[in-house]
Amino acid sequence: MIKTDALIIGAGPTGLFCAHQLGLIGLNCEIVDNLDKIGGQCIELYPDKPIYDIPAVPECTGEELTNNLIKQIKPFNIKFHLNERVEEVNKVNNKWIVKTNKKKEFVTPNIIIAGGVGSFEPRKFSPKECEKYENRSLFYSIKDKTIFQDKTISIFGGGDSALDWAIELSKSSYVNLIHRRDEFTGAQLSIDKIKELEKSGKLKIYTKYQLNSVKGEQNIKSIEIKHDDESLKELETNYVLGFFGLIMKLGPIVDWGLNLDKKTIPVNTENFETNLNGIFAIGDICTYPGKLKLILSGFHEGALAARGCFKYARPDEKLRFEFTTTSKAAQERLGVKK
């Protein structure tokens, strides 16, 4: 049985920064995530994709952001339990008893849900034969863009992910961009850019087409795409990428007694507590009036949720607000040497 001041469910940027905020105020925590690596969607979906809206960081990748957050929480010696999912949550004597699918048991006054409670699954191609090529020459997310260098890539989708990767991969590969509709739904700047790239011969756009079949032995050699008018076209290609969005499955969380709004958890905006005392929700999983699904917003939510945990972890103490620039206690916890 593992005792901790707070258990964070989700090892993405929001959960990592919340762990930092807990450490600053003297609370310990452990982190559980059903993914096999730290970083959440940042690492799983766009480790190499640039992020432009982190304060004071003009540009960084999901991997760089994750690595910096890990470095930031290093002084607190936080233990991670990866590739593990929370299955049961029960309250006994003002403590939450949390059990995972690997039979671990945590006792804590606080649970912070920062994602990691369910799973994100990509919407997939319809043709059944696509399954045999998955993670070899057909992908729904990109973890290492270098494998596509000097290859022909066929990208399916019309949203931001498809457009962004078409632009990025066209720098070192030839790209076919295929969309089932006549118009793209991504940012206008990206739409303008792909049209420029087509004019320069860097990529080819096919609209009103969908994947009809895939050909190849171990790896894909060519694909057949079908137009709305039923005409067929065959394209030679080395890799196929599909960006049709994600389906989120909440998993066991639906049985925990939380109020749910579709696939999100309503919270207050004072400390992002749910309808259950001692359970907080931050990041994309939570909802409230004016909610923005930004990493920046998740950092704010994590900071306030951490302070909300203090009253349950230290009921006989009063939390004083202090700046890290002047707080000796915070600096000692961070290992600052003077």
Swiss-Prot record:
FAD binds at residues 14, 33, 41, 46, 86, 120, 284, 325. Binds 1 FAD per subunit. Belongs to the ferredoxin--NADP reductase type 2 family. It comes from Pelagibacter ubique (strain HTCC1062). Gene3D superfamilies: FAD/NAD(P)-binding domain. Its cofactor is FAD. HAMAP family: FENR2 (MF_01685). Its EC number is 1.18.1.2. This is Ferredoxin--NADP reductase. Homodimer. It catalyses: 2 reduced [2Fe-2S]-[ferredoxin] + NADP(+) + H(+) = 2 oxidized [2Fe-2S]-[ferredoxin] + NADPH. Signal peptide: none annotated. The keyword Electron transport does not apply. The lineage of its organism: Bacteria, Pseudomonadati, Pseudomonadota, Alphaproteobacteria, Candidatus Pelagibacterales. The keyword NADP applies. Transmembrane segments: none annotated. One of its GO terms (molecular function) is NADP binding. InterPro entries: FAD/NAD-bd_sf (IPR036188), Fd--NADP_Rdtase_type_2 (IPR022890), Ferredoxin-NADP_redctase_2 (IPR050097). Keywords: FAD, Flavoprotein, NADP, Oxidoreductase. PANTHER family: THIOREDOXIN REDUCTASE 1-RELATED-RELATED.
